[in-house]
Every structure is written in structure tokens, then in C-alpha cells.
């Protein structure tokens, strides 16, 4: 690490949302991939092709982070197709996943735009309840430990206080603009990239970022 952390609040007791706004795009993909990973676990390796075939017929392609998950567009497609999960999981096992994803979809409509819907609190609370019901179902019925990822944690614990303070939806704090710059940055970084174990790795990364930024002026 060649630069200190940029986030160093004087008061460590302040709400995390006052320092880092909830990342709208990553929350969306995080919740959906949480469900996606659970579906994969429920089906098992021997039924992986069943999931892939079900996905292909619904325009879902696995090409997310490190090639194991769903990116933004495919997350939306999986969210839309989740109503059909009973086809591969059965009605009983699919029900709590479908319920959670349906309620998350309502949350995105209520909270992820610039303006909050009047009943956003009720919609968000209903989603939070569905998360705990899914965790409980996995533990009791499936004997699966469904861990809470940091994105699920943010969605359950930190989004509501942030929205109550700002009285606005998450759109104005979306990281999507920065995400869309990945390709342009990648072109510059390819010229200077070093293996992470190379002693010049950090220096070259900083140089690449500086060169890219200087070209934007």
C-alpha cells in the first residue's frame, strides 16, 4: 500500500452511511448473487448443468466477478426470472427465495430511484423480514448455513438510517458512473500492469491512474 486510507473519520462512532453512502449498484448485484449462490448450493455440482440450462433460456449468463456470479444486467435478468425457480428447486424450496427476491425488487422500485415512494419503510421492512425467514428456512429445513454477506448486512442494517437522514432515494449516490469507466481505465492500465507480487506493482498502478486522470482534463 503506497497511500494511506482515504476514509479516516475523526469520530469512529458516526453512522457508516455518513462516510460512505450505500452503494446502490453493488447492493443490487450483492443481494441477487446471494440468492444465486444459494440456488447453486441447493442444486449441487451434479445439477449445475440444470441451472445453466434454466438460465440460458432466460437470457442469464454467468460472467460476474471472477467469472462465478452475475453482473448487473444478468442480475436483473435473474431477478425477473426468479418467479420460475420452482421449476428447478420445487415449490417448497423455491418459495422463500422467490419471496425474498420479489420483496427486494419492490425495494429497488421504492428506494433506488431519486425519489422515495411514500411507503418505502414498509416495503424495506418487509424485505428485511424475508431475509431472516430465508436464513431460518435454510437452517431448519435445508440444514444449510446461509451466511450474511456484507452487502446483505448493509441492506438490512444501514440503508434505512441513510434514507431517513437524506429523505432521498439512492440514485444520486450510485456508483454506476464510476463502474462504467472500467473499460477506459483498463486500456490504460494494461500498459503498466505488474503482477501483484512485483515490487513495482503499487507504483505502476498509481502511475496508470495518474496518466488516465491527466488525459481526462
Which positions does each model-derived feature cover?
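A structural signal for the principal folded core domain
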Residues: 1-217
